[in-house]
């Protein structure tokens, strides 16, 4: 007969009870009431946060945007074809994040940070919130360093500084993207990380931009975030924030960054589409009431950080497309009021062969000469005034038949100044050469050269300076000033070029 020992049995039971762990998994689950047009109405998610990520049964991710009393309006970040009415939705408890790191340089990714260039996965251990708070007042420093675009008209009259927000605005096909791409190409060797965000563009356009940057050797320090025209409105809406998050990683690590949002008109349209489908009340031009906040919270993330935070910077160049040159429409006026200046590209100038087609009259940089080296300040001071007076005289001279000699001289000078500011695409000019070109034009050295030969003369002068007067560029590069030695070298180069110029 088996001898039963009650004390042993009770100790075994006690041990089992001690080891028992009742793990309760609590998840916030809701039900899809309605689905269509990239929007889902979900019932039962009472504890969900604004902007929280939700997971549907088919693994599609959505963002909770509308929190109403009886349902939640969710925008889908994908096709969502497998989602049915009555299917379940789970709250993840997470806010949208994107992986960040140096591995993103030279890559093309979508709005969620997933590579779409066929070069394999990107390994990053760090992530950043897609929407993070902009640096505060104490964290910032005033803009004091230039970011050279390589475009003479911009660097001389509408200078851009590191940490500035400068709007590029104009009608379609006026060269807005070209200005942005030229600026990226000109950062070669400057230790500036560039992020190009393409919103609502054709895939072919993005592919040609990638090819251009690759040919010019600029893709190595650039990341491209693309939300193409056929992507859901949600991805077009979050793509600029993803680009800002990738750039912020480098900014907080003490590096200078440049972000181009091309373009924010399409982002606003995508946001309008989402808002109307979510039944938010429409305002002016059918945009929702918070469309200003859409752009301000994005552009306020651009900053020049204080030395305590590493002195990094994020320069933002948002692009806005106008309709028939109307800069007083809703989105253009909003973004003009948020940014620190604008570069206005005119269709009329573009068609007249003046490229880049910058309208100097209404283009402005609110940072001004703080974003220029001393050498540029010394020579470019008169340029904007001379061009403004020339534009006025040119309009007046169409009606007046006989003009005095002084007016004729001023018109001739103005035509030559306008000529030296013309520049072919993807051909940035170094700041030393820009100083030389402007000095030559402002001081009348081109007055005796025919207008149609000015550009050839300038090309010859640049070649002459590079080959026979390399000390000139060294002086400006090292001292950042246009001193008497540099001036004498330049005058000598101008004289030599004139002698050999036929």
UniProtKB/Swiss-Prot annotation:
Keywords: ATP synthesis, ATP-binding, CF(1), Chloroplast, Hydrogen ion transport, Ion transport, Membrane, Nucleotide-binding, Plastid, Thylakoid, Translocase, Transport. The record marks 363 as: Required for activity. Its main location: plastid. ATP binds at residues 170-177. It is a peripheral membrane protein. It catalyses: ATP + H2O + 4 H(+)(in) = ADP + phosphate + 5 H(+)(out). One of its GO terms (molecular function) is ATP binding. It is an enzyme of class 7 (translocase). GO terms for cellular component: chloroplast thylakoid membrane; proton-transporting ATP synthase complex. Belongs to the ATPase alpha/beta chains family. F-type ATPases have 2 components, CF(1) - the catalytic core - and CF(0) - the membrane proton channel. CF(1) has five subunits: alpha(3), beta(3), gamma(1), delta(1), epsilon(1). CF(0) has four main subunits: a, b, b' and c. PANTHER family: ATP SYNTHASE SUBUNIT ALPHA, MITOCHONDRIAL. This is ATP synthase subunit alpha, chloroplastic. It comes from Guillardia theta. The gene is atpA.
């Amino acid at each position: 007969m088996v001898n039963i020992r009650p004390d042993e049995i009770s100790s075994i039971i006690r041990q089992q009870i001690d080891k028992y762990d009742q793990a309760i998994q609590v998840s916030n689950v809701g039900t899809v009431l309605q689905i269509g047009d990239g929007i889902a109405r979900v019932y039962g998610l009472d504890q969900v946060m604004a902007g929280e990520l939700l997971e549907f049964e088919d693994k599609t991710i959505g963002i909770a945007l509308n929190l109403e009393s009886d349902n939640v309006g969710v925008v889908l970040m994908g096709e969502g074809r497998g989602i049915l009415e009555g299917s379940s939705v789970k709250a993840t408890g997470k806010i949208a994040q994107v992986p960040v790191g140096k591995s993103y340089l030279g890559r093309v990714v979508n709005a969620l940070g997933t590579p779409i260039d066929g070069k394999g996965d990107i390994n990053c251990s760090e992530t950043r919130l897609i929407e993070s708070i902009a640096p505060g007042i104490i964290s910032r420093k005033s803009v004091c360093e230039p970011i050279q675009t390589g475009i003479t008209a911009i660097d001389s009259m509408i200078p851009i500084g590191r940490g500035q927000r400068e709007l590029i605005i104009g009608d379609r096909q006026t060269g807005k993207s070209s200005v942005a791409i030229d600026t990226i190409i000109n950062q070669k060797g400057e230790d500036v990380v560039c992020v190009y965000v393409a919103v609502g563009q054709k895939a072919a356009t993005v592919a040609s931009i990638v090819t251009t940057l690759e040919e010019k050797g600029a893709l190595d320090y650039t990341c491209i975030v693309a939300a193409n025209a056929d992507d859901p409105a949600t991805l077009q809406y979050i793509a600029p924030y993803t680009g800002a998050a990738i750039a912020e990683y480098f900014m907080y690590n003490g590096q200078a960054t440049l972000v181009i949002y091309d373009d924010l008109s399409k982002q606003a349209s995508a946001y309008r589409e989402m808002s109307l489908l979510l039944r938010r009340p429409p305002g002016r031009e059918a945009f929702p009431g918070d469309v200003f906040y859409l752009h301000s919270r994005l552009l306020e993330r651009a900053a020049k950080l204080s030395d305590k935070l590493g002195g990094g910077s994020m320069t933002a160049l948002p692009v806005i497309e106008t309709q028939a040159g109307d800069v007083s429409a809703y989105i253009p006026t909003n973004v003009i009021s948020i940014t620190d200046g604008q570069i206005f590209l005119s269709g009329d100038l573009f068609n007249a062969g003046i490229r880049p087609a910058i309208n100097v009259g209404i283009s402005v940089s609110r940072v001004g000469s703080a974003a220029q080296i001393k050498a540029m300040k010394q020579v470019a001071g008169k340029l904007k005034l001379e061009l403004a007076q020339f534009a006025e005289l040119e309009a007046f001279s169409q009606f007046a038949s006989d003009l005095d000699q002084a007016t004729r001289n001023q018109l001739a000078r103005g035509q030559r100044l306008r000529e030296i500011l013309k520049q072919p695409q993807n051909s940035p000019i170094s700041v030393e050469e820009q100083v030389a070109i402007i000095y030559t034009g402002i001081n009348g050295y081109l007055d005796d050269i025919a207008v149609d030969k000015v550009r050839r003369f300038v090309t010859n002068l640049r070649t002459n300076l590079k080959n026979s007067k390399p000390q000139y560029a060294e002086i400006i590069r090292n001292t950042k000033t246009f001193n008497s030695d540099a001036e004498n070298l330049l005058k000598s180069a101008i004289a030599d070029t004139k002698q050999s110029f036929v």
